[in-house]
Amino acid sequence: RVSSAVSSLVSSGPTTPAALSNTISSAVSQISASNPGLSGCDVLVQALLEVVSALVHILGSSSVGQINYGASAQYAQMV
């Protein structure tokens, strides 16, 4: 599931705000389906851990190039 989350996040690009939401939603659905006995809280915690793992993997395999400070306002709006 983590590799699926990585693929989903990378393919949607860095400026797609819905990508993270969709990835979390997908992880929640998959975890709920494969572990019907888990509580909603447990499912959410597991999903968030998997998404954070995916983000760490992406950051770990990325290389930072030239930074466009002029576009920082656009990225700040996403947060």
Curated annotation (Swiss-Prot):
Main localization category: secreted
Organism (species): Araneus bicentenarius
Subunit composition and interactions: Major subunit, with spidroin 2, of the dragline silk.
Domain notes: Highly repetitive protein characterized by regions of polyalanine and glycine-rich repeating units.
Entry annotated with the keyword Transmembrane helix: no
Gene Ontology CC terms: extracellular region
Function of the protein: Spiders' major ampullate silk possesses unique characteristics of strength and elasticity. Fibroin consists of pseudocrystalline regions of antiparallel beta-sheet interspersed with elastic amorphous segments.
Pfam family, one: Spidroin_MaSp
Family under the similarity heading: Belongs to the silk fibroin family.
UniProt keyword Secreted, yes or no: yes
Top-level taxon in the UniProt lineage: Eukaryota
Keywords of the record: Secreted, Silk protein
Localization terms from the record: Secreted, Extracellular space
Name of the protein in question: Spidroin-1
